[in-house]
Every structure is written in structure tokens, then in C-alpha cells.
Amino acid sequence: YKVTLKTPSGEETIECPEDTYILDAAEEAGLDLPYSCRAGACSSCAGKVESGEVDQSDQSFLDDAQMGKGFVLTCVAYPTSDVTILTHQEAALY
């Protein structure tokens, strides 16, 4: 799938297979995104989905209300369609 990442330094579109976490694909493409635990248990890598769908069933940090607003943990999110994500959204969670 095509994953568009809107970062503070600009917009990048990368290819991300449906079995690869978005954070991992971004790193392979040379992008520097924030992360900490890489296990879906903190909010360092949080982003916000602007369009498209992801599967983040491996995460354990976000509550239903946060996910309902479109927040996503990129370290444990797989794309299930072409998706656009606003990165660096940890502060917006709180």
C-alpha cells in the first residue's frame, strides 16, 4: 500500500506491505520518525490517520476514544488500504 506520512519536515509517500509495520517501512525508507518502546505500549510514535485504514490490533496503549479520533501507534500499525498519517502527534493525545 501507499502510505503518506505528513511530518514536520514535509510529506513523504512510501510503500508499505500489509504485513509490515508502518514505522518499520518508514525507517527502511530512511525516514526519521519518533518511537520509544516499539511494542505498542507507549505514545512516542503516535500519529493521526487522515484518510485510509490501518490495523493496530497489536497495540495496548490507546483507548477506544483515542482510536475513534484517528490516533494510531505507527510501531504496531499495518496498512489495510492506502493511508495518510500525520506524524509526531504524541502531544495531541493529551
UniProtKB/Swiss-Prot annotation:
InterPro entries: 2Fe-2S_ferredoxin-like_sf, 2Fe-2S_ferredoxin-type, 2Fe2S_fd_BS, Beta-grasp_dom_sf, Fd_pln. Its cofactor is [2Fe-2S] cluster. Disulfide bonds: none annotated. GO terms for biological process: electron transport chain. It is found in: Plastid, Chloroplast. One of its GO terms (molecular function) is 2 iron, 2 sulfur cluster binding. Keywords: 2Fe-2S, Chloroplast, Electron transport, Iron, Iron-sulfur, Metal-binding, Phosphoprotein, Plastid, Transport. PROSITE patterns: 2FE2S_FER_1, 2FE2S_FER_2. CDD domains: fer2 (cd00207). Belongs to the 2Fe2S plant-type ferredoxin family. The keyword rRNA-binding does not apply. The keyword Plastid applies. It comes from the Eukaryota. This is Ferredoxin. One of its GO terms (cellular component) is chloroplast. The modification Phosphoserine is found at S9. Its main location: plastid. Binds 1 [2Fe-2S] cluster. Residues 1-91 form the 2Fe-2S ferredoxin-type domain. Ferredoxins are iron-sulfur proteins that transfer electrons in a wide variety of metabolic reactions. [2Fe-2S] cluster binds at C37, C42, C45, C75.
